[in-house]
Amino acid sequence: MKNEELKAMKNFYLKKMFAVVVILFTACVTGLADDHKGRLQVGTGFLYERGMDLTVAYERETRYHNAWEYFGNVYLKWDECSSCGHVCPKSFWSNYNTWGLGAAYKPCVVRGRNHHGNLRIGGSLGSDRHGVVGGVHAGYEHSYSLRKGWQVYWQMKSDLMIGGKDLFRTGVVIGVKLPIK
């Protein structure tokens, strides 16, 4: 009789423990299956007139594909060399460079099955070789979802730079977003 009672008690506790594990598992899995993902974003492109842009950012997606982006940006503007008359390494790398750190809010304006589009509104603060440069950024970004959380995107951007050599920067950037867990 004792063996039967022990077996019944053991089965009861095993069933209870199994039920607790199933409940915890379902609660945790559904808690992780959302759109609130962080992504590492790397993009490069060309800006008018004779400018090149590299942006590395962390994007935090909120509800309905809206997002916050925290970015670091490097800008290079090249010019023709005065001695040789065309672009040489010195006139390319040493003409005008800026860097900046900033944030942008990206409300979603277009949603589709495997893509979405966001407005990009933000600001930055950085430096060139001589002083402080501030920026007001506006544009449009369209992202396409790939497998395993990867995304590719293109971005049309316009920057109003305060205190720099360029007042307006307009161009196109393409890049990739890598999921961060």
Model-derived features: positions:
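Solvent-exposed loop/turn segments connecting transmembrane beta-strands
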Residues: 42-55, 93-97, 125-136, 160-169
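Compositionally biased, low-complexity repeat tracts
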Residues: 27, 34, 39-41, 96-98, ...
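A periodicity- and composition-biased signal for non-globular, repetitive helical segments
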Residues: 8, 16, 21-22, 66, ...
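Cleavable N-terminal export/targeting peptides
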Residues: 1-37, 180-181
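Small/flexible residues
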Residues: 12, 17-18, 41, 62, ...
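Internal, hydrophobic beta-strand segments that form the core of beta-sheet-rich folds
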Residues: 155-156
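Short glycine/proline- and aromatic-enriched beta-strand/turn motifs that initiate or cap beta-hairpins
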Residues: 31-78, 171, 177-181
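Gram-negative (and chloroplast) outer-membrane scaffold detector with strong preference
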Residues: 59-152, 178-181
